[in-house]
């Protein structure tokens, strides 16, 4: 913080206060997902599984629905109910969820 404050008050000509912090500020893309998901990171797979939970939330409009649906990396009773309620192929989505977990 001191480095940031001193750089903004000095006449060093830094283009941005963030430049003073250094360049190592990468964000791990996997951090946007549940850390219980131990399988191979597959953005498309997670998008499909997450979409089931978001659609289920939109049907029931209860905040806990989306959270419960995503718990344990989509391997839970709520996810199964959501898949069935949305009239998706249950066995297909269960295989997808299990592959995200292992």
Swiss-Prot record:
Which cysteines does the record link by disulfide bonds? 37-73, 53-69, 56-82
- Listed GO CC annotations: extracellular region
**Which SUPFAM superfamilies does this entry report, sorted A to Z?**
Crustacean CHH/MIH/GIH neurohormone
Keyword entries, A-Z: Disulfide bond, Hormone, Neuropeptide, Secreted, Signal
The answer to whether the entry has keyword Secreted is yes
Where is this chain compositionally biased, Low complexity type? 1-16
Q: Which domain of life is it from?
A: Eukaryota
Q: Name one GO molecular function term.
A: neuropeptide hormone activity
Q: Which GO terms describe its biological process?
A: circadian rhythm; neuropeptide signaling pathway
Give the chief site where it resides.
secreted
One Pfam family from the record: Crust_neurohorm
Q: Please give the residue ranges the record annotates as the region Disordered.
A: 1-33
* Subcellular compartments: Secreted
Span of the signal peptide: 1-30
Q: What role is this protein assigned? A: Inhibits Y-organs where molting hormone (ecdysteroid) is secreted. A molting cycle is initiated when MIH secretion diminishes or stops.
What family is this protein classified in? Belongs to the arthropod CHH/MIH/GIH/VIH hormone family.
Full protein name: Molt-inhibiting hormone-like
């Amino acid at each position: 913080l001191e480095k940031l404050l001193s750089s903004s008050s000095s006449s060093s000509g830094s283009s941005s206060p963030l430049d003073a912090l250094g360049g190592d500020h990468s964000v791990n893309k996997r951090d946007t997902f549940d850390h219980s998901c131990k399988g191979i990171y597959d953005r498309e797979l997670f998008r499909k599984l997450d979409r089931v939970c978001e659609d289920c939330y939109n049907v029931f409009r209860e905040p806990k629905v989306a959270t419960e649906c995503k718990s344990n990396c989509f391997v839970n009773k709520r996810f199964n109910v959501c898949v069935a309620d949305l009239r998706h192929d249950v066995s297909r989505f269960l295989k997808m969820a299990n592959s995200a977990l292992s």
